[in-house]
UniProtKB/Swiss-Prot annotation:
PROSITE patterns xrefs: LON_N, TPR_REGION, ZF_RING_1, ZF_RING_2
The name this protein goes by in its record: LON peptidase N-terminal domain and RING finger protein 1
Region (Disordered): 1-35
Molecular-function GO term, any one: zinc ion binding
Organism in which the protein naturally occurs: Mus musculus
Gene: Lonrf1
Signal peptide range: none
Residues in Lon N-terminal domain copies: 547-757
Superkingdom field: Eukaryota
Length: 762
């Protein structure tokens, strides 16, 4: 007799029908009055599995199968969230790049356009912002490109702020970049060396503000006026194109953007702007191609990826699926060259969870790139569009367009037809570079983006512009804080040892301190290397001398005054005082990773004997404190005391046990050693379980008996382990530490064990 079907929750959170039969081609069979709820739970589990299947197929490079799975999930009721299609977009971009033989476009070398040029747009470095990885960008690029990674080192840029309520994605990265102020030193140098360029950059910034406020007429007038004075400024042409697009004068916007592409054919932002114009004009397929071209050149261009996600989400929506996914919608996708995609097996029939497991798809993405014979932004159109030549604009670049289709009045026609874009369109070479179909014109040499901004008159080079405000010396390993101030790395670290605030503006640097990256500001260092080589050489010489002085292991050895330490015994430390933070950091930076440990002394500040500690690991806490894992090394005697930057130092000599050569004395020492070792084991085993577990947790297990008693300068390791765990006065322990005779040390330990063994027997 079968029991009624009962819904149960799977470990993954999906609901499955248990106990009831399910038809292969029909809905879930459920009993009782909760049929609607049970069916909703089953459908939810099904589309979640389809989404996971689509992600796995996309990660495996199976584009068509991934498209089918995502479309099926949306039809089953999955929420239409574009951000869930990230893996599908990555697969699509990879396929596009492979098909067109493209490679990711890294930033140009600094020398290509001068040092004071933006790594992203290659333009003048206006309002330079230094990101955490140490590279500098103009604020315009960080705001408008909304980069997720550094263009040069591929390091992640600061994350955007938390998403506001009702927003599926975090706000643009520009919100986070706003927390990073303009670099004070770099901005001062840019204004001092290139005042004209700086003023033009300010004017461009005002254009950006007008566009942001939607004042397109004013922005257009200002851009045209600026271009009359600087006709070769490509940034101004981009601003003018955006003004045209805001006024729905799409043809004029495309002409400006193509003029920019003619000069810089591998600039991802321009492809994105051009795609946005076509998207606003209604040419979805052409826009998609341009967004993919943008991502093929720069896979971290976040706005383009978001637009592709939205387009794919629309194409895969149930409405489009029910219409059969028209060929015009899918022909723009790379590697989908055959008839339009249908989804008979995945979409029309229900499947069990077992049937939705990942299988090898029948069709695979083509691996070999094929030469591109047509325009990359030209999609197959359902209707032929006759193009009419348009007189050239002031930039001399001819355009071929259907003018009525690009006007605001023809917007309704645009939504139904494909645009036969431009006679001069972009092609892709096998080497990954773009070229123009029309070869009669070549990019001009006086482009604003190729001016060598690095040619600085000698009289403008002033070493005081490169001085650290803390040490008043030339920057050495300069770092820039989020508030925009620059310091020597060591100087800033020492300040943050005392308080997590900027030494100049007192802005909180708690997050900067917790990150602990301190990446060198590359541009500032390159400027010093190029223009102040002699001063830098002298500064480096001073630094090397200071480092060598800190590297001595017998003179001016740093002393940590805290507790007893013993050879081979672990000694964990919690370091919170600024002076000891500095001491630990210097020990690591010099490479010695060693310092002395002594107990305090009322007369001489610290004892005459101590033990060197070797740093094994350091765990830094967000507020600058650290937990240092050390182990004891050599014993030493203090010869001379000193002080450096707040912590104690000492000249020392190392202690070694006096070796015994006489055979009878060696046998006697062996007998004493074995006797004390057995006595120590007995005492430890007779301890209460609580005490024994605490000792094992803190010091580890007792070392094994050693065959060669004089193999090391400090004797058997178990002696020091036992001395560390025995509850005796530190002065008594210090006297044992200072002994250079193993026999005397064993005798002392034997006396202590005898005393404690009597207490255990009571």
């Amino acid at each position: 007799m079968s029991s009624p079907a009962v819904a149960r929750a799977s470990p993954g959170g999906n609901r499955e029908a248990s106990g009831g039969p399910r038809s292969r081609n029909g809905p879930w069979e459920v009993g009782g009055g909760g049929e609607r709820l049970e069916r909703a739970g089953a459908e939810s589990g099904r589309w979640e599995l389809l989404l996971r299947r689509g992600e796995l197929l996309a990660l495996g490079g199976h584009l068509k199968g991934a498209l089918e799975a995502f479309a099926a999930a949306l039809r089953r009721g999955a929420p239409a969230r574009p951000e869930r299609l990230g893996s599908l977009v990555d697969c699509l971009v990879f396929s596009y790049r492979l098909r067109h033989g493209l490679r990711w476009s890294a930033a140009p070398a600094a020398g290509a356009a001068g040092l004071l040029s933006c790594l992203s747009c290659r333009g003048f470095l206006s309002e330079p912002v230094t990101v955490p990885c140490g590279h500098s960008y103009c604020r315009r690029c960080l705001r408008r490109e909304l980069r997720a990674r550094c263009r040069l080192c591929r390091d992640r840029l600061p994350p955007a702020a938390a998403a506001s309520e009702g927003t599926p994605r975090p706000p643009p990265l520009a919100a986070a970049i706003a927390d990073f102020r303009t670099s004070v030193v770099l901005n001062h140098l840019a204004e001092k060396w290139f005042p004209g360029q700086r003023e033009r950059a300010r004017a461009a910034g005002r254009l950006g503000e007008l566009l942001h406020e939607g004042r397109y007429r004013e922005a257009l007038a200002a851009a045209c006026d600026a271009l009359r004075a600087e006709p070769s400024d490509l940034t101004l042409k981009i601003y003018r194109a955006e003004s045209y697009a805001g006024l729905q004068e799409f043809k004029a916007a495309l002409e400006d953007l193509n003029a920019v592409l003619f000069q810089l054919p591998n600039w991802p932002e321009v492809y994105f702007r051009k795609g946005k114009v076509l998207q606003d004009a209604g040419f979805l397929g052409d826009a998609l191609q341009l967004f993919l071209q943008c991502l093929a050149l720069d896979e971290d261009f976040a706005p383009a990826k978001l637009q592709v996600e939205k387009i794919l989400c629309d194409l895969l929506s149930p409405e489009n699926v029910r219409e059969g996914l028209k060929e015009s919608s899918w022909s723009s996708l790379p590697c989908i060259k055959s008839k339009p995609l249908g989804f008979p097996s995945v979409m029309e029939q229900p499947h069990s969870p077992a049937e939705l497991g990942l299988k090898q798809p029948e069709e695979r993405v083509e691996d070999a790139p094929e030469p591109v014979k047509g325009s990359l932004s030209r999609a197959q159109s359902a209707q032929a569009i006759s193009a009419a030549a348009v007189p050239a604009r002031e930039d001399g670049l001819k355009r071929v367009c259907s003018e009525p289709l690009l006007s605001a009045q023809g917007k309704g026609v645009l939504l139904k037809r494909k645009l036969s874009l431009l006679e001069q369109d972009v092609l892709i070479n096998e080497d990954g570079r773009s070229k123009l179909k029309k070869q009669s014109e070549s990019p001009s040499e006086d482009c604003m983006f190729s001016i060598a901004y690095g040619d600085i008159p000698e009289e403008l080079i002033d070493v005081s512009d490169f001085e650290c405000s803390l040490c008043m010396r030339l920057f050495f390993e300069p770092v820039t804080t989020p508030c925009g101030h620059s310091f020597c790395k060591n100087c800033l670290e020492r300040c943050l040892d005392h308080a997590p605030y900027c030494p100049l503006c007192k802005e909180s640097l708690k997050e900067y301190l917790a990150d602990r990256r301190y990446c060198v500001t590359q541009l500032l260092e390159e400027l010093i290397v190029k223009y102040l080589p002699d001063e830098l050489s002298e500064r480096k010489k001073i630094y090397d001398e200071e480092t060598a002085e800190l590297s001595h292991l017998t003179k001016n050895v740093p002393i940590f005054v805290c507790t007893m330490a013993y050879p081979t015994v672990p000694c964990p430390l919690h370091v919170f005082e600024p002076r000891y933070r500095l001491m630990i950091r210097r020990s690591i930076q010099t490479g010695t990773k060693q310092f002395g440990m002594c107990v305090s002394d009322t007369q001489n500040s610290f004892a005459d004997y101590g033990c060197m500690l070797q740093i094994r690991n350091v765990h830094f806490l967000p507020d600058g404190r650290s937990v240092v894992d050390t182990v004891g090394g050599k014993r030493f005697r203090v010869l001379k005391r000193g002080m450096k930057d707040g912590y104690c130092t000492a000249d020392i000599e190392y202690l070694e046990d006096v070796k015994i050569e006489n055979g009878d004395e060696i046998r006697s020492l062996r007998e004493l050693h074995d006797s004390v070792y057995s006595q120590a084991c007995s005492w430890f085993q007779n301890l209460r379980d609580r005490f024994r577990s605490q000792i094992l947790q803190h010091f580890g297990s007792m070392p094994e008996r050693e065959e060669n008693l004089q193999a090391t300068p400090n004797g058997p390791a178990w002696c020091w382990w036992l001395l560390a765990v025995l509850p005796v006065d530190p002065r008594y322990q210090l006297s044992v530490l200072s002994m250079k005779s193993l026999e005397e040390r064993l005798t002392k330990i034997q006396h202590i064990l005898t005393y404690f063994s009597r207490d255990q027997s009571k």
